[in-house]
């Protein structure tokens, strides 16, 4: 079985990598298990040495790593370079802050001393998607490794070159520091083979990023094996714009949020819920900004919107747009399949969308913006929560009003007057069908530790 990477800007196959055989899977898991004791005993300073080396290697090789993303999943080169830097920052952040995050906590009780310490679980499997190959790998691996676990990366089969390159970065860092290679290993697999790896006794936990359907499948297997899982799943993120918002700033940020990575982001603003009083003014601004975007070759540094990653994804996106227009939404921009090679899709603006239309009910994974009207702030809040998803949200209003509204939005993170983004310093994750558990920040590193309570009685004798 081959894992095949296709350039989405041309439709041409650019790489074929053999999937791991059952024997190679066994060898990989055995190596990860064998490395656990040495990695755990290396201590935080020794682990930090490796993560700092990973960060340095990512930065030194950014010009060769970033084009892999552009080639295999169509990310514009300017964004790809930014992603490599963000991945390096994540490694660096946990190298510098894991000791504080994992510090032993003394807790008063009837003991002479009682405390909580954070111990590694063992080997953590990361099952990751294609849309941010380097960032998501480091988001998973950096905290897991700094907590003393070993990590096995099962990346999306459409980005095998990225996965190999990530494995090589870690291999160099581990070799230079004298750590076992089994601390971090790349495992090229088809999606159908993941369940067997989760069931393996040598895997203690799993981190999954991807669709709600995929997350449900992973959660079912992990639950049957009584293994912890963190799920970061899809989102249909609301962006609420109230009458007292700065419309120019809101339009700039909303347009940027929706077209980063050609709109293929779980935390992008997808449902723009606008108070009636400023609806027309905001829509005019959004249309102007989307119309001015440069769509084209992702290798061109001037390109702002690249292709959709796969043909089937573009077909599904166009279906969502078509069904929404057929249901009564107004198509103000885009919405047509372009001629020529590759899987491009134009920035698309849909107005007068209602919460029962396809573009509001389903997650749209592409540069498609759906605008919904709300008569007032209460109606906007109701619309924001009218979804099965709960990953992220944003609110444009006064800071005080935005913070008050955030408490009533069912989402794992809310940005007030700013773009929703992931940050190594801050936890992120979802509720409802957007998953459970948290990535990043002090909360993320504690997802894959044994929070061990120790109770010490008086000295005997």
Residues covered by each model-derived region:
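Short, well-ordered beta-strand elements within core beta-sheets of diverse protein domains
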Residues: 13-20, 35-41, 126, 239-242, ...
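N-terminal Rossmann-like NAD(P)+-binding subdomain of aldehyde/semialdehyde dehydrogenases
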Residues: 1-112
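Conserved C-terminal structural/oligomerization subdomain of aldehyde/semialdehyde dehydrogenase
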Residues: 10-16, 203, 321, 326, ...
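ALDH superfamily catalytic-core signature
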Residues: 213-354, 416
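Residues at or immediately preceding the N-termini of alpha-helices
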Residues: 8, 22-25, 44, 62, ...
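Structural signal for hydrophobic packing residues in well-ordered secondary-structure cores
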Residues: 36, 40, 55-62, 66, ...
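Residue-level signal for inorganic ion chemistry
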Residues: 11, 47, 69, 91, ...
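Rossmann-like NAD(P) dinucleotide-binding subdomain of oxidoreductase/dehydrogenase enzymes
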Residues: 107-249, 374
């Amino acid at each position: 079985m081959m894992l095949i990477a296709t350039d989405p800007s041309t439709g041409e196959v650019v790489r074929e990598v053999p999937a791991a055989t059952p024997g190679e899977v066994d060898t990989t898991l055995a190596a990860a298990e064998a490395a656990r004791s040495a990695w755990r005993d290396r201590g935080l300073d020794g682990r930090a040495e490796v993560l700092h080396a990973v960060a340095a290697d990512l930065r030194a090789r950014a010009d060769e790593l970033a084009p892999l993303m552009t080639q295999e999943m169509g990310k514009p080169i300017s964004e790809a370079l930014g992603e490599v830097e963000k991945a390096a920052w994540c490694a660096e952040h946990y190298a510098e802050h894991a000791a504080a995050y994992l510090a032993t906590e003394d807790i008063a009780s009837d003991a002479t001393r009682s405390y909580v310490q954070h111990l590694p679980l063992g080997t953590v499997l990361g099952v990751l998607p294609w849309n941010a190959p380097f960032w998501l790998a480091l988001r998973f691996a950096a905290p897991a490794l700094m907590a003393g676990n070993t990590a096995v990366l099962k990346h999306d089969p459409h980005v095998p070159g990225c996965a190999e390159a990530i494995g090589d970065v870690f291999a160099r860092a581990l070799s230079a520091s004298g750590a076992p290679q089994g601390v971090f290993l790349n495992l090229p697999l088809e999606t159908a083979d993941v369940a067997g790896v989760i069931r393996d006794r040598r895997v203690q936990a799993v981190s999954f990023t991807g669709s709600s359907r995929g997350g449900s499948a992973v959660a079912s297997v992990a639950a049957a094996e009584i293994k912890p899982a963190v799920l970061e799943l899809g989102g249909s993120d609301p962006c609420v714009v109230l009458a007292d918002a700065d419309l120019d700033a809101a339009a700039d940020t909303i347009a940027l949020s929706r077209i980063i990575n050609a709109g293929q982001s779980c935390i992008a603003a997808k449902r723009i819920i606008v108070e009636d009083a400023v609806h027309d003014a905001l829509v005019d601004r959004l249309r102007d900004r989307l119309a001015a975007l440069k769509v084209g070759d992702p290798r061109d540094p001037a390109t702002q919107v690249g292709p959709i990653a796969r043909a089937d994804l573009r077909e599904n996106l166009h279906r969502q747009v078509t069904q929404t227009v057929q249901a009564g939404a107004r198509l103000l921009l885009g919405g047509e399949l372009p001629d020529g090679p590759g899987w491009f899709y134009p920035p698309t603006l849909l107005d007068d969308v209602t919460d029962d239309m396809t573009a509001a009910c389903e997650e749209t994974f592409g540069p498609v913006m759906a605008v919904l009207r709300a008569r007032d702030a209460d109606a906007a809040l109701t619309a924001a929560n009218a979804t099965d998803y709960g990953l992220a949200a944003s609110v444009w209003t006064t800071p005080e009003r935005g913070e008050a509204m955030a408490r009533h939005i069912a989402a794992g993170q809310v940005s007030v007057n700013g773009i929703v983004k992931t940050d190594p310093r801050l936890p992120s994750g979802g509720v409802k069908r957007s998953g459970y558990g948290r990535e990043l920040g002090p909360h993320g590193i504690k997802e894959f530790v044994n929070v061990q309570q120790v109770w010490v009685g008086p000295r005997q004798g």
